[in-house]
Amino acid sequence: RAKLDSKKRVAILGDGLIGCEFANDLSAKGYEVSVIGLGQWPMERMIPQPLGESLQNALSERGVQWLLQDSIAKIEPMADTCAELHLTSGKKITADLVLSAVGLKPNVSLAEQAGLEIGRGIKVNQFAQTSDENIYSLGDCVETEQGWQPYIAPINQMIPSLAKSLLGEMTPIASTPT
């Protein structure tokens, strides 16, 4: 927060959940916000296009600038307080502060210490059981047969099945979106 004190223009690298949360909060506080992301719409890997476009429109109405299907090629310091961002598209923007909201990585250290099977996340079966059948896992640290599941939709999809399984009625996860 202290880094924001004398800043006006904030560039956010990442158009996912965290990037959009930053954009929402900072634009609400009056900052000039630019979001740079690889997606065609915000949160592309998490929500369908119509919802993503609605989110984009709502944040645009607050002044958020979107630089989608783009990335930072180079950051060039300018004055003491700002930098010019050179994007892969050739566009340039100036920012007083750059926030990185990319690169989720699950923390699996406790699961490793417990001797559980780890891949990109904590491996679970169709019941959300780990390699120890008495330990279940849920959240952005989980890896199912479909791969790592870092987003909200797969977590919500798993909750009802996990709850039933924990209560003794082993219920497979109906479908785990990727």
Describe these PLM feature segments.
Residues 102, 161-178:
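Rossmann-like nucleotide/phosphate-binding core characteristic of flavoprotein oxidoreductases
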Residues 4-5, 12, 77:
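Residue-level signal for alpha-helix termini/capping positions
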Residues 1-5, 81-86, 91-164:
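FAD-site-proximal beta/loop scaffold in flavoenzymes
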Residues 74-81:
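Feature captures the FAD/FMN-dependent oxidoreductase FAD-binding
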Residues 9-11, 17-74, 155, 171-178:
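Rossmann-like dinucleotide-binding cores of NAD(P)H-dependent redox enzymes
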Residues 22-31, 83-86, 163-165:
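Short, composition-biased local secondary-structure segments
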Residues 77, 130, 173:
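Conserved strand-loop elements at the edges of beta-sheets that form or border functional pockets
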